Amino acid sequence: SEMCIRDRIYAQQLVVKNKGGKISVVDGTKLKVEDADEIIVLMSAATNYVQCMDDSYNYFSQEDPLEKVQATLHKVADKKYTALLATHQKDYHSLYDRMRLNLGNLPEAPVAPTDSLLKGMDENTNSEQENQYLEMLYFQFGRYLLISSSREGSLPANLQGVWGERLSNPWNADYHTNINIQMNYWPTQPTNLSPCHLPMVEYVRSLVPRGKYTAQQYYCKPDGGNVRGWVTHHENNIWGNTAPAKKSTPHHFPAGAIWMCQ
């Protein structure tokens, strides 16, 4: 299926593979699976958004994203679940296994279920080892989130990562340069996740042309001469917004570009 909103095209397709039972189409819009022993649902989605530094493209390509979606599904449709899982695990562990953390010679296997550990920490009933394990788990959970939401060729992790459940998410799922985006990316180099830093680097580069324009409009010299450098403020997004989002003082934060380039 495809959806187009103001030149933005969103395409998505599903492939449903059943073992036993049958699949039927209902009302031309729904798939009905009956009496199956198991089903595997493969989903691919894409848009015509292109992150670039050339305003003439207006961030949209002329390509139909449905073709990319179909090509992706064609590559995996005949693969077994075990093969897909193995590919995923190999890809994930190539990053996750770059470092290990062990606080006090703890076993790598869970010492207790996570919900039990969280409850125990809240109620102060955990042992020292259980709390250490939970802290270690929480540390690695942060790495998991970044590995899952910031990969080469993608956009950087925003306020909700890739887990926004709505078409319009809180704070527009954008980027806040006064602390949030830094909190997402501070761990990349210290925890050996350099490849996950690349989307952030490319995103910063894409802001430069609009940032130069904003700097000229807001901070031009008294004699009207050109300013040097570029700027972005409290909020920015994938559409190149670098101006203050509102008139309030917190939004007038010209140090955003400096923060991101540290």
Model regions: which residues?
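Short, small-residue-biased leader/transition segments that mark boundaries at the very start
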Residues: E2-I5
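Extended, hydrophobic/aromatic-rich amphipathic alpha-helical segments that build helical scaffolds
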Residues: M43, E135-S149, A257-Q262
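Structural helix-adjacent loops and short alpha-helical linkers that scaffold large soluble proteins
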Residues: K79-A83, G104-N105, T125-E135, L146, ...
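Active-site-adjacent "gating/activation" loops or surface patches in catalytic cores
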Residues: Y213-C261
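Solvent-exposed loop and edge beta-strand segments that line ligand/cofactor-binding
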Residues: E123-Q132, N169-N178, P244-A255
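Active-site-proximal, well-structured secondary-structure segments within enzyme catalytic domains
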Residues: A86-Q129, G153, N158-S168, N226-R228
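Carboxylate/His-rich catalytic cores and anion/metal-binding grooves
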Residues: F139, L146, N178-G229
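Beta-strand-rich recognition/accessory modules
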Residues: K17-T82
